[in-house]
Amino acid sequence: VVNFSAFETFYSDRRPFFAENNNLFDVSDYMHRIINTRRIGGRPDYDCSIYGELEEYCRQNKSETSEIDFALKYTQKGEIDFGFMSASERDEKFSKGRDFYALRLNTKSDNLQYGYLGTYVDKPLTDESAQVNSIDFLYLPSEIHRMDGNFMHSKVKDKDGFGLTAGYGYTPSKNFYSGIGIKYYDERLDLNDMGYLILNDRFMFNGRTQFKRTSFQ
């Protein structure tokens, strides 16, 4: 599949280590994901201009993937669910591997679930780092009402970015659903070093009502 649009297409990770037992780290909706594990082992960072006479050779020998030296994931369920993820890429001839870290905390209290997810990426080739912090919640006051939200902050190249999503859903029966939501991503919000954001500098308001009728012979 070739994507000719101006927006990056999200593809889920099929590598077993990253795909399995990963629900604790899943803070996302269709516009963004705080963690996109396909970034780990992805296209390396390059700056071929620093290699002088080898600059053209560097440009012609860029790799599309990075080798992974190691990856670690630990989760623990309890009153406070805890998760930690770390991975380090291997250095190659014209690039230096990045280091990825993620920390997840999540807890429940009656009908309220809330948590924190933070990521940090160290990029030694460019001597830069990327940090994202997010707070998410899910509130279920009754069987038919649902409220959720995600507040995000990024710090990339010393620039702070902010975003939030919030939604309300009403499901009085299995055949009817109605909901509204808002999304705000400012022009400096950048999740893409370890996450996914289809586009920033957007404010969106959306609503949906659905009626479903099913009959069986």
Residues of each region from the PLM?
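Outer-membrane beta-barrel channel domains
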Residues: 1-217
